[in-house]
From Swiss-Prot:
Induction annotation: By light.
CDD domains: Sigma70_r4
GO molecular function annotation: DNA binding; sigma factor activity
GO BP annotations, alphabetical order: carotenoid biosynthetic process; DNA-templated transcription initiation
Residue ranges flagged as DNA-binding region: 136-155
Function, in words: Sigma factors are initiation factors that promote the attachment of RNA polymerase to specific initiation sites and are then released. This sigma factor regulates genes for the light induced biosynthesis of carotenoids.
Positions of region (Disordered): 86-106
Keyword Cytoplasm: no
Name of the featured protein: RNA polymerase sigma factor CarQ
Keywords on record: Carotenoid biosynthesis, DNA-binding, Sigma factor, Transcription, Transcription regulation
PANTHER family in alphabetical order: RNA POLYMERASE ECF-TYPE SIGMA FACTO, RNA POLYMERASE SIGMA FACTOR HI_1459-RELATED
Record-linked PROSITE patterns: SIGMA70_ECF
One Pfam match: Sigma70_r2
């Protein structure tokens, strides 16, 4: 990043090639929409280009990059909630709850559905800790909170997942 910040144009290509797969995976798990994740990946790296002058040498690049990606995902999810709320008011013919999709009963799908129902802060902490393997210290540094607060967010996410997946188990048993 320091080479790119100092004006080496080929350095950006190296950064993108090295980090894009990881960032896209993170974004895909956060928004659970491949096309949106791709758009957010592009927006993230566009922000890197625009913000390169604010990058401080010696700063760890991955947390800086993931902060940009996480903020992009949060903004997109916030926007989507507003769109969904508006659409649900406009479309009263659509039933409020659809039947579960019997064609794909896999645990992975149910887990991803449950993840989407978590508060964005909790989902981010769960994904970063359990999927990406980040420590609570790293998550705290990313979000500007204490490691204990990061742990609490993840714990609340785990509890909600247990609740949601338990409800699913009851529905399947009926």
């Amino acid at each position: 990043m320091e080479r790119f910040r100092d004006g080496a144009q080929d350095a950006f290509e190296d950064l993108f090639a090295r980090h894009a797969p990881r960032v896209q995976g993170f974004l895909a798990r956060m928004v659970r929409n491949g096309a949106l994740a791709e758009d957010l990946l592009q927006a993230t790296f566009l922000s890197v280009i625009r913000s390169r002058g604010r990058y401080e040498p010696g700063t760890r690049f991955i947390p800086w990059l993931m902060t940009i990606a996480a903020n992009a995902a949060r903004d997109a999810l916030r926007h989507q909630r507003h769109v969904d709320a508006y659409a649900s008011r406009e479309d009263t013919a659509t039933p409020a709850s659809a039947a579960p999709d019997d064609s794909d009963p896999s645990l992975r799908r149910h887990l991803l559905d449950a993840l989407q129902q978590l508060h964005p802060d909790h989902r981010e902490a769960v994904v970063l800790s359990k999927v990406e393997g980040w420590s609570f210290e790293e998550i705290g540094a990313l979000r500007g909170i204490s490691p204990g607060a990061a742990r609490l967010r993840a714990h609340r996410g785990y509890e909600k997942l247990r609740e949601l997946l338990g409800e699913l188990e009851l529905e399947v048993a009926r």
